[in-house]
């Protein structure tokens, strides 16, 4: 199974059993400029403590405990405010870096009398294609498109500049396919990283005809996840993630015993959580964990599920003291997992599909390093280097494996 859909997923699904480990995601992610965190200030709990009257505060153990908790919350509030401000500043800097070159280009073209030719985003390209092939009325929008218009649809203009692969020239005639033929063709196209967009557009061309078919629905949800993966624009990522999640939910409603529906709904929940506030992140975390476990019960031989669970366990096992303290203070319990549990899932992935992904080998090696088994770690690092570098996830894993090998040789 292609493994590029795993990219960035775990960053959005660290909520854990009670949504707690999503706080860990927040703690790590605030230093990365790609994601904007609009968390509500964690001041409400502090205010509740502040409103308590403690007449015997200095003499009562209970009063001292409340004072201590209040001070803890005040520290967390200040920390949250500081990190949020840092993230907002980094997002503004990133925006300026992207905007200034385009502004310079526009000015040069204006004075030079040139005509600017921009690359077309995949979302605009797909819609333009449909406009030339199928005449649709203004009322024919699907429910997923309507949802995207509620706040997640992007401004589809030719001025958007993207840096990812574009599809080859598209035919102006849509070939009508039977459902089984369509699904086979879409699955086959998706096995090639460079053909994922074509697979997505093929499914979109037939969504009005097969929108009630479960096998079609979960594949279309998966395809929206692929487009999330390919997109570099934050707005487009939001658009694809939200529509995909809606489709995944519809698929589960129609077929609650279909493991693929639960799998890809969980994946899309993780993607959506990238752009949500703290409360919704926790909710997405609940959904991810719940549907991942259901999918494992229904698809016990699916390697992707164990890889995702391994990533989850590995991240939770590495929570720092302050992350655990924050989780306990805010939610009353601490998420728990071990490196051994993570390793078990990564090895299960390898057992089900040898050479599943470079990333799986990389995380297996990391587990062995932490367990004090450098020889096993080297073994899996070397196995990782035997695999081809195809996706961005592969490139990141390859770089990390090289660092690990250098460290193990010391």
Curated annotation (Swiss-Prot):
Gene3D superfamilies: Tetratricopeptide repeat domain. The keyword Cell membrane does not apply. InterPro entries: RMD1-3_a_helical_rpt, TPR-like_helical_dom_sf. The keyword Coiled coil applies. It is found in: Membrane; Cytoplasm; Cytoplasm, Cytoskeleton, Spindle; Cytoplasm, Cytoskeleton, Spindle pole. The chain crosses the membrane at residues 9-28. Residues 120-151 are annotated as: Disordered. Its main location: membrane. The modification Phosphotyrosine is found at residue 152. Belongs to the RMDN family. This is Regulator of microtubule dynamics protein 2. It comes from Mus musculus.
């Amino acid at each position: 199974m292609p493994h590029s859909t795993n990219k960035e997923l775990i960053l959005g699904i660290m909520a854990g059993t009670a949504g707690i480990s999503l706080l860990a995601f927040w703690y790590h992610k605030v230093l990365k400029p790609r994601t904007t965190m609009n968390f509500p200030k964690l001041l409400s709990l502090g205010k509740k403590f502040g409103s308590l009257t403690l007449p015997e505060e200095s003499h009562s153990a209970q009063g001292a405990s409340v004072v201590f908790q209040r001070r803890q919350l005040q520290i967390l509030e200040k920390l949250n405010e500081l990190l949020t401000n840092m993230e907002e500043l980094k997002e503004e800097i990133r925006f300026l870096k992207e905007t200034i070159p385009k502004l310079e280009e526009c000015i040069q073209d204006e004075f030079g009398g040139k005509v600017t030719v921009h690359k077309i985003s995949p979302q605009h390209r797909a819609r333009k294609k449909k406009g030339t092939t199928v005449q649709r009325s203004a009322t024919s929008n699907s429910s997923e498109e309507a949802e995207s218009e509620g706040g997640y649809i992007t401004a589809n203009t030719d001025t958007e500049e993207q840096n990812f692969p574009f599809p080859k020239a598209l035919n102006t005639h849509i070939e009508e396919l039977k459902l089984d033929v369509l699904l086979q063709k879409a699955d086959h196209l998706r096995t090639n990283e460079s053909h994922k967009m074509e697979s997505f557009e093929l499914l979109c061309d037939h969504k009005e005809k097969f929108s009630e078919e479960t096998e079609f629905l979960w594949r279309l949800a998966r395809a929206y996840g692929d487009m999330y993966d390919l997109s570099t624009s934050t707005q487009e990522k939001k658009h694809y993630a939200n529509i995909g999640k809606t489709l995944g939910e519809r698929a589960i409603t129609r077929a609650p015993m279909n493991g693929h529906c639960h799998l890809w709904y969980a994946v899309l929940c993780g993607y959506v959580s990238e752009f949500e506030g703290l409360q919704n992140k926790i909710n997405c975390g609940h959904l991810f964990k719940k549907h991942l476990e259901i999918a494992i019960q229904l698809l016990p031989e699916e390697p992707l599920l164990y890889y995702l669970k391994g990533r989850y366990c590995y991240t939770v096992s590495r929570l720092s003291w302050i992350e655990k303290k924050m989780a306990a203070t805010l939610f009353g319990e601490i998420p728990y997992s071990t490196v051994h549990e993570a390793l078990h899932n990564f090895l299960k992935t390898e057992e089900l599909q040898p050479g599943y992904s470079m990333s799986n080998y990389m995380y297996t090696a990391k587990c062995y390093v932490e367990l004090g088994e450098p020889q096993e770690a080297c073994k899996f690092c070397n196995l990782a280097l035997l695999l081809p570098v195809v996706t961005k996830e592969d490139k990141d894993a390859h770089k990390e494996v090289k660092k690990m090998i250098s460290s193990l040789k010391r």
